[in-house]
Every structure is written in C-alpha cells, then in structure tokens.
Amino acid sequence: MERIAVSPDGAGFVLVESRRPFHPWGMNYGNKGRLMEDFWDQDWQTFADDFRELKALGANVVRVHLQYGKFMSGPDKPNPQALTQLARLLRLAEATGIYLDITGLGSYRPADVPAWYDAMDEPARWAAQARFWEAVAEVCRSSTAVFCYDLLNEPISPGGKREAGQWRSGHLFGGYDFVHHIALDPAGRKREDIAVAWIRQLSGAIRKHDQEHLITVGLLPWSRQWKHLSGFLPSSVAPELDFLSVHIYPDAKKPDEAMECLRQFAAGKPVVIEETFPLSCGVVELETFMRASREIACGWIGHYDGDTLAELDALKEAKRLTAPQAVYREWLRLFVRLQPDFAR
C-alpha cells in the first residue's frame, strides 16, 4: 500500500509513489450496533470477516472510532492491550488493502467514560487528549494503511458557559452520544479561536511521532437554521488541517440544503463527506446529492453495521427484513453501484 498525500493542486488526494489520484470511498465501521472495542478482544474473526466484506463491496477506506475510555487507563496511562489491538488492526488493514480513517477520543457510550476524564478542567482534559493521540500516533506512524487521523467526532466549541463535567451533548442516538464539547467556558474567547488552539495542541501531539499521515476533524454540518453550530468555522480551521471532513445527511424535506451546506466547506482544502446515509431521505435523493457533491467533495464515507448484502438479500427473500435492515440494504446496493464512478 502506498501512503496517501494531498494532491499538488490541493483539491484532492494522491498515492505518493505512483502519483495516481485517490478518492476515499468507504464506510464508518460498526457491527450490530456495537462499538468495535465491545467485541474485538473476544471475537476478532467477526472483525476480520467484516473488513474482507467491506473490501469486497468496493470500499478503500474504513473509518474506525477509538473510544477514549478503552484506550486510556488514566490521564497519562495508555492501555497497552488496546494499543496491541490497534496494531493488530493496522496489520489487518494492510493485509486486506483497506486504508483507515482513525477517529479518536470517542466517548460515545456515557457509561464507558471514566469519571476522572469528565471531572477534568479544560487544560487537563486537552493534555489528556494529547496524550491519547501521542500513544496512537506512536503505534500508527509506520503503517501505510493509515489514511488519516480524525481528532474527534463532531466537536463543538461552546458559545456559552456549560455546567461542570458536561462535555457531551446529552442527546443520545441509538444509545450513543456522538457530539462532544472541547471547552465548557469560552471565558471571553472567540469560539473559532478555541477550536484553532485545540486543533494545534492535538495535532502537535501527533506530529511528535508522525509527521506524514494526514490530520482532519469530523465536523458537524452547516444548516440554514443554525449556520455553523459547532463553532468550527471552515475558514478558520482549514489552515490547521490537511483536509476538511463534514457529516451531511440529506433531508428529503430540504432538497437543496445538503449542497448548500457542502459549499460552506469549500475553503481551499480537499473536502471529504465523512458521514452520509439515507437517514432522512431515500436512496434516490441521496444519489442525487452524492453525484452533485463531486463539484466540491473528493471522498465519501457511509455506514456499515455488520450485515452483508447477501445476508440482507436472503432476509428480504424470506420476508424477514426489518425496516432498518431495508435501509442498509438499499444503501449497500447504492454503494456498490456508484463505486466505479466515485472510487476511480
């Protein structure tokens, strides 16, 4: 596998040695609603089988979500067992020919978040987050399977003071909280300045060990109602990142908003749609958006939850397909059909 870099024109990606263009085309990884750390110690075979299935579907990138509480035993104590499994994951990705979008600092399941982590003040928390990324980068630095490091999924730089310990959004989706605040009190600072300072500290931690692999952040979308709700303004954070990642789920009731959102992220760096799915629309609307998105985006990552297309087809034939499974089936069929055009 060749290392991936930003293309000379700054609009996309290339494979470093061959200089061939690279278009990320893949999935956010999950299995039956589980986080990978829930089962990868006891059932690695399922994990490995899923990667082979994703490769067969045409994916060249898989986004994996590392949970902070599983990777850190204390503020300055990485968990060696988790790092061993991460190294094993890198070998699996290399053997399978799949690149990894390594997203860190996950606190998705509130019950798994260490009490000491939530009790920290901002400087201590940022330092603990930097230590996490140092440990991860030290393991990953020599692997050609790393596409990028995503510092945190859907961070928010707060617009006002929050209660002590309220780092997460408090809004669960499927039992998980995917949105995290990087500070609890702006204390007179601009939201975008907090975001830039946080990115610099965590990127610096990675660069202590890995000067080559790309760095990004998985950003919440712009909307007509809320604008840039996250406080991570593309114009401010783009200079600090190798490329921009945005999460866009088209809404059938607002057919033009998805592209309007995407245009807000055209800030002089490559743009990857790091999450998308027919969550609030059908596959026809999603395909329309994805095809239009090529005006700006150069990579697309959807969702996978462990059911193969063959398994879903069999369930449909047996008339035992649930509504959520039907949505996944339609998405996987679209993913396979679009792959030749999008991952070229």
Where are the regions a protein language model picked out?
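Substrate-binding surface in catalytic domains of secreted glycosidases
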Residues: 252-259
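Surface-exposed substrate-engagement region within the catalytic domains
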Residues: 260-271, 285-295
